[in-house]
Amino acid sequence: MSRRVPDVVGEYRHISVDLLDRDDCRVKLGTVAGITHIFFAAYVEKETSVASVPPNVDLLRNLLDTVEPLSPNLCHVNLMQGSKWYGNHLGPYQTPAREDDPRHMPPNFYYDQQDMVAARAAKKSWTWSAARPHGICGYAVGNPMNLGMLISVYATVSKALGLPLRHPGSAANANALYQVTDTKHLAKSVVWMSTTDACASE
């Protein structure tokens, strides 16, 4: 599901729904029963970290409020987070980052989402997990947050202008630790997380 109708036709049933709109969720998702696993990757960009918290929590809350009552066999909710959990948007942070590292000073909507899901799961029979990839490369229509696409565009423009392909940043930036995962590997990993008991509530 997504708010925007995808340009790509596939072997799936797409539901166009605005997760920020509780009524739209009830109308569009109110007939979808029997969901066992939720893979949540919705995101709303705002100008500040403070402003990002309410809408990003609402996206998830509206989904769960609608789907949970219709899905008594819900088993697992997976949250797609990212390295902002560790504070990469605030500057240098300890690497390698670990899941049990202390949280940075809020606000961070990942914290609010995870706390909400953990609190709900504690009262239910379903579990949750969180994936925190750094950079993601893969096919994503209309999504500029894709390092592979950005490098491809930069290389194409450089070639068209007759320029050599050079790193556009500083030496420190070029030598910084950065991890990238492919969307196919990421998809396999979250399916594994959502079906492996050892990953429950992690």
Give the ranges of each region predicted by the language model.
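Short catalytic/ligand-binding loop motif for oxyanion handling, primarily in non-cytosolic enzymes
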Residues: 9, 47-49, 85-89, 138-140
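Conserved Rossmann-fold NAD(P)-dependent oxidoreductase catalytic core, especially the SDR/UDP-sugar
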Residues: 36-40, 50-51, 55-109, 121, ...
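NAD(P)H-binding glycine-rich loop region in Rossmannoid oxidoreductase-like domains
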Residues: 6-62
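Alpha-helical substrate-binding/gating segment
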Residues: 155-170, 176-202
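Conserved beta-strand scaffold positions in the cores of enzyme catalytic domains, especially
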Residues: 14, 128-130, 202
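Residues in the short beta-alpha loop(s) of Rossmann-like NAD(P)-binding domains
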Residues: 2-5, 83
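Glycine-rich "substrate-gating" loop/helix at the edge of Rossmann-like oxidoreductase active sites
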Residues: 102-105, 134-149, 168-183
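Conserved beta-loop-beta element that borders a ligand/cofactor-binding pocket
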Residues: 117-145
